[in-house]
Amino acid sequence: DRLIDNSSNGFVDLFEKDINKKNLNLTAGRSVVCVDRNGDGKYGIYVANYGGPTRFYELRTGQILDLAEQLKIDKITGGRAVVAGNILSGKTDIFAANERGKNFLYYNSDGFFQDIAKDYKIDDQYENGRGTTLSDILYRGRLDIITSNWNGYHRAFVLEDNKFKDIATPTYNIPTRIRTVTVSYTH
C-alpha cells in the first residue's frame, strides 16, 4: 500500500520512510475509508484486508501508527467493502462487508469501536459481501445500509425497533455477480 503526501518537496510515499516501514500493510487491501473517530476533524484510514488483519492508520507527528489492535478491530477475514458514517452512535461508525465471514458493524464509543453486527442482525455470515454504501433509503433523516453479495442475496438494511430489517425488493435481492453499489438521489 501507499500513502502519498503532497509535501513542499513534491509527492512523498509516507510508507517509504524508515519510521513507517514497520506498519506497512503487506496483505491484500481491498477497500479503504477515512474515519474521524474522535469527531475532531482528524481522520484515520480503515483498510479492509483480504486474508490479513484490518488496519487502522493514523498519522501522529510524521509517524504512521496502526491502531487496529488497540481499537479492537484487527480481525482477519475476507474484507471486501467498508463505509463509514453516522449509522447509530451519533458519531462516525463503520460497516464492513466481508467474504467468507461475518460482516462488522463497529459502533463508535468515544473513539473506540464495538462490533454489534450480530446484535443488529446484519452479520450476514453466509454471504460474500461486495459493494456497500450508506443512504437514507426512506428519506427519514438517518443512514441505512445497502450491501451486495457475490452470487448471494443483496440487502437494504433499515433500522426498525433497534434492529436492522432487510427491505430489499425481490428485484434487487436476486443473487448476481455484483461488485459495486452506488446511490443517486433525484428530487
Indicate where each model-derived feature is located.
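Acidic/hydrophobic-patterned starts of short beta strands in beta-sheet-rich repeat architectures
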Residues: 39-48, 89-97, 140-148
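Repeat-based blade/solenoid architectures
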Residues: 20-32, 72-83, 122-133, 170-182
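Extended non-membrane alpha-helical scaffolds
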Residues: 83, 88-91, 117, 129-134, ...
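Conserved small/polar residues in nucleotide/adenosyl-binding loops
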Residues: 185-187
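Disulfide-stabilized cysteine-rich extracellular repeat microdomains
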Residues: 8-9, 16-19, 37, 61, ...
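Internal metal/ion-chelating core segments
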Residues: 78-85, 94-104, 132-133
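Beta-propeller blade repeat segments, especially FG-GAP/WD-type strand-to-loop junctions
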Residues: 1-15, 53-67, 102-116, 153-167
